[in-house]
A protein has these predicted regions:
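Bacterial N-terminal signal peptides that target proteins for export
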Residues: 1-11
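Bacterial N-terminal signal peptides
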Residues: 10-19
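Sec-dependent signal peptide cleavage junction
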Residues: 20-31
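Surface-exposed repetitive/solenoidal architectures
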Residues: 29-100, 117-119, 184, 205-206
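Secreted/extracellular small peptides and ectodomain modules produced from precursors
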Residues: 31-33, 109, 119, 159, ...
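Short, T/G/N/S-enriched strand-turn elements that build extracellular solenoid repeat scaffolds
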Residues: 40-41, 93-94, 127, 160, ...
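Structural signature of tandem-repeat unit edges
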Residues: 49-57, 76-89, 99-112, 122-135, ...
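Consensus positions within tandem repeat domains that build extended binding/scaffold surfaces
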Residues: 91-94, 114-117, 137-140, 158-161, ...
């Protein structure tokens, strides 16, 4: 009987040890930090959500202006970024190469997204609230998974700002100043509409896209070099 008891105890321990050694299910942890005097951030490890609370302009990444952003420690984990109201501009390189970032929620009064802000966010496919944006910086959304992007109120699009993205269709507003190679290498871009009032189609603007249809208004007086190069499917 004692022998059977010992055998039972051994079996019980054998079953219990893996449970004891197993790492506990990760509890929700919220990491917080500050950057300069006007910005606070938090990261929720359970929801994989980053929240940015900033009054005024966000600072730029150290790659650009020598400032270290603590939230970049979570660049591989973050899937969503929420910007609270009060932010006027998103800093240069602020979320560059957040490779698992899928969606962002922008504040209603955001005006500027600076250079390289979301460049290399290869899974980014959803943006909420971007009607107030006026300027998109150089490479701001290059190499992302964005299929849709409203340019309705945009006044300035800098070089390569949406290059190598997954855009399917685009409409360019009348009063927008457009940099070079803005849609370069958007291999899924099949249709583009340029509103009356646009005067220039910039260098390499639609280079290497899948463009099949484009509407060019009579207001256009200049088409830049290589604007439609490698658009092998372009019909009209």
């Amino acid at each position: 009987m004692a022998k059977q008891g010992r055998i039972f105890a051994v079996i019980f321990l054998a079953l219990l040890i893996p449970v004891l050694l197993k790492a506990p299910e990760s509890e929700a942890k919220v990491y917080r930090g500050k950057c300069k005097s006007n910005l606070a951030w938090s990261y929720d490890s359970k929801t994989k959500t980053m929240v940015i609370d900033c009054k005024g302009d966000m600072p730029d990444d150290k790659q650009f202006y020598g400032l270290d952003m603590g939230w970049k420690e979570y660049y591989l984990q973050t899937k969503k970024v929420v910007f609270k109201e009060g932010i006027k501009s998103i800093g240069a390189g602020a979320f560059e190469k957040f490779q698992n970032l899928e969606s962002i929620v922008l504040p209603r009064k955001l005006c500027i997204i600076k250079n390289w802000a979301f460049s290399g966010c290869i899974k980014l496919n959803k943006i909420k609230e971007f009607r107030s944006i006026r300027t998109i910086g150089v490479n701001a959304f290059s190499n992302t998974a964005l299929r849709k992007f409203s340019l309705k109120n945009i006044r300035r699009m800098k070089n390569n700002c949406l290059s190598s993205s997954k855009l399917v269709e685009i409409s360019i507003p009348a009063n927008c100043k457009i940099g070079s190679f803005v849609f370069w290498d958007c291999k899924k871009l099949k249709k583009a509409t340029i509103e009356r009032g646009v005067k220039n189609i910039s260098d390499g603007m639609f280079c290497a896209t899948a463009l099949k249809n484009i509407t060019i208004p009579g207001s256009v007086t200049k088409i830049g070099e290589d604007a439609f190069s490698y658009c092998q499917n372009l019909k009209k």
